[in-house]
Amino acid sequence: MDFLQRDTVTIAKDLLGVRIIYHDELQTFTGYIVETEAYIGTKDRAAHGYNGKRTPKVESLYKQGGTIYAHVMHTHLLINFVTQLEGQPEGVLIRAIEPEEGIELMAINRGKNGFELTNGPGKWTKAFNIPRHLDGSKLNEGRLKIDTKNRKYPKEIEASGRIGIPNKGEWTHKPLRFTVKGNPYISRMKKSDMRQPEYTWRI
């Protein structure tokens, strides 16, 4: 996947349906990305790189596109894929996954099952048993990979405001969150809006 020659919003949309794979010492976990959020760098008041902020904790965000930026928020590990050229702190937060392989162990890792398994940015990383030390490593060069060949394609993509970023002016409501419409593994999904997962993808 091209993380350098396309804008971050385009990448965030294109990641929907991409197969994500993590190999730990015991198990391979896989699933399909169903929810992303784009963060647009120095001008984005909700972004970690807003105004060029650069600390050791966010240093990975300034690396070349295709780098993994892993950070902890409220004890939850969040995984972002860095986009753009080195020095431009833009990226895509992977918010939710439709699980595929390793579901039984995911349920043990999470202490949950069903749609609660992976329907949030800290939930799927716990289900997949992803460690923080992936921060700064390159996607597809270690244990965390994406597969763009054996992927799915959403029937419909919805755009909405990002979650959990109040008081950021216009950036609070900008439609930079992208979801596979109706997929039940999306975070904060109303039951009345849920469809069976197979009906949310193009055949």
From Swiss-Prot:
GO MF terms, alphabetically ordered: alkylbase DNA N-glycosylase activity; DNA binding
UniProt-recorded name of the protein: Putative 3-methyladenine DNA glycosylase
HAMAP family: 3MGH
Keyword terms of this UniProt record: DNA damage, DNA repair, Hydrolase
Enzyme Commission designation: 3.2.2.-
Matching Gene3D superfamilies: Methylpurine-DNA glycosylase (MPG) (3.10.300.10)
Protein's UniProt keywords contain DNA repair: yes
Annotated TM spans: none
PANTHER family hit by this protein: DNA-3-METHYLADENINE GLYCOSYLASE
Taxonomic superkingdom: Bacteria
Pfam families registered for this protein in UniProt: Pur_DNA_glyco
CDD domains (alphabetical): AAG (cd00540)
Similarity comment text for this entry: Belongs to the DNA glycosylase MPG family.
BP GO annotations: base-excision repair
